[in-house]
A protein has these predicted regions:
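General beta-strand structural signal in soluble alpha/beta enzymes
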Residues: 50, 117-123, 168-172
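Structural/interface elements that position substrates and couple domains in central-metabolism enzymes
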Residues: 27, 97-100, 166
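Rossmann-fold NAD(P)-binding glycine/threonine-rich loop
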Residues: 90-136
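Rossmann-like NAD(P)-binding element
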Residues: 45-85, 89-95
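Residues that mark the start of a beta-strand
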Residues: 1-2, 85, 142
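Active-site-lining helix/loop region of Rossmann-like oxidoreductase modules
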Residues: 140-199
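NAD(P)+-binding Rossmann beta1-loop-alpha1 motif at the extreme N-terminus of oxidoreductases
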Residues: 1-39, 43
Length: 199
């Protein structure tokens, strides 16, 4: 299984640190040349591999960690995303709900990435929290997942556990996606909730 993070701002780097912490190799890409962020990637760890966008999207599981607006530009990198899992880490800050047809922002992302199996997740934590070791006082930091594809959600749940988190599935995008979205000025009830689960 191969992994990529598209977007290397605060959230993208926080995700990369989670992969590095657990010795899992991941490609990172932006719309810029990989040389422009190679030193930042190297500072996180040797398993963080800078790539061109066209190469990074060959991965099996892709974390979309860009601002909401450019997600449609990233979606144009491939004619079809069939067979790939997209983890939507975006938040539609300031995007009026009417621009999204009243639907969850994750539904709009799913429509842009034709054929992909989309899982909404890892977006409800701010970067400063997401980048921390998720092992907290004997428990594990919670990440919420929502998807219309149960098998994809299960796969990302396993990955989340391998990264040290405790995944909680919220159901489909229309229900669970609404709970963890920041869309326009209406925020879901679970957005930015930093919770720890004790087994």
């Amino acid at each position: 299984m191969s992994y990529a993070i598209i977007g290397f701002g605060n959230i993208g780097q926080a995700l990369a640190k989670a992969f590095a912490r657990n010795g899992i190799e991941v490609s990172v890409a932006t719309t810029r040349a990989p040389e422009s962020f190679a030193s930042a990637a190297a500072a996180i760890g040797p398993g963080i591999i800078p790539k061109k966008l066209a190469d990074a999207v060959k991965a099996d599981i892709i974390f979309l960690a860009v601002r909401f607006g450019p997600h449609s530009d990233v979606a144009k990198a491939l004619p079809t995303w069939r067979g790939k899992i997209i983890v939507d880490v975006t938040n539609a800050y300031g995007v009026p709900p009417e621009e999204l047809g009243g639907q969850p922002s994750s539904k709009a992302v799913a429509q842009a990435f034709t054929g992909a199996r989309l899982v909404k997740g890892f977006n409800h934590l701010v970067a400063a929290v997401l980048e921390q070791d998720p092992a907290v006082h004997g428990g594990r930091r919670v990440v919420f997942l929502a998807s219309d594809d149960d098998a994809a959600a299960a796969e990302i749940g396993t990955l989340a556990e391998n990264l040290g988190f405790s995944p909680i599935k919220l159901g489909g995008l229309s229900e669970g996606g609404l709970l963890v979205q920041a869309r326009g000025n209406s925020w879901g009830r679970l957005i930015f909730k930093d919770l720890v689960k004790f087994d």
